[in-house]
Amino acid sequence: CDIDTLYNKLLPAEAVPQKLKEKLSKSELYSSSLTISVALNCTAESLGFKDVMLYLFNDETKRTEHISGDPHKSFISILAPTVRDKTLAPEGQGTLNIFVPAWMMYEDNWKTKVNEKGEFVRTDEYKALKEQFAQIIFERVEKQVCPNLREHILFYEVATPVTYHRYTHNKDGS
């Protein structure tokens, strides 16, 4: 869990000094991420992924933009776990995990609605935004590393900060 949940919800109130709680309430959390888990119809190596991890960024982009959550400017981390461990996919196939910094407040909480319980409701607009973001990332990966990546995708799943919040209850999906 995140530090806010730990100190303010899980531990007994008397276990954490008030001064520490105040300090923590002012701390800035690290971004969450948008994660694209990809199943390939070929090996990752055959598409040019020779290393287990690849980091894509533009030297001319400011560091603050690299972590901004903007799908056009944020850095991209690509993990190709099947480069090292062939047992993670059927023979002749591969996987990629693509990570991009993302923030919960992006596009009005990813175009979700909040219900009476305070839960994020994933709308059709949310699903469309998630897909649009993923396609921008695929386009960038194709430009910089693998020109025909989308032709080799069997399946992919996209997780946003909303997804991480849903399953972990971490503040802002961080």
Ranges and model annotations:
Residues 1-91:
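Mid-domain catalytic core of redox enzymes
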Residues 6-9, 101, 136, 140-144:
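Generic, well-ordered alpha-helical scaffold segments in large soluble proteins
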Residues 12-14, 113-115, 155:
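Short Gly/aromatic-enriched secondary-structure transition segments
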Residues 38, 98, 141:
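Hydrophobic, well-ordered secondary-structure elements that form the walls
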Residues 59, 83, 103, 158-160:
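Residues that form or immediately flank small-molecule/cofactor binding pockets and catalytic motifs
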Residues 74, 86-136:
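Glycine-rich, aromatic-lined ligand/substrate-binding cores of catalytic
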Residues 77-79, 138-139, 143-174:
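A glycine-rich dinucleotide-binding beta-alpha-beta segment and adjacent secondary-structure elements
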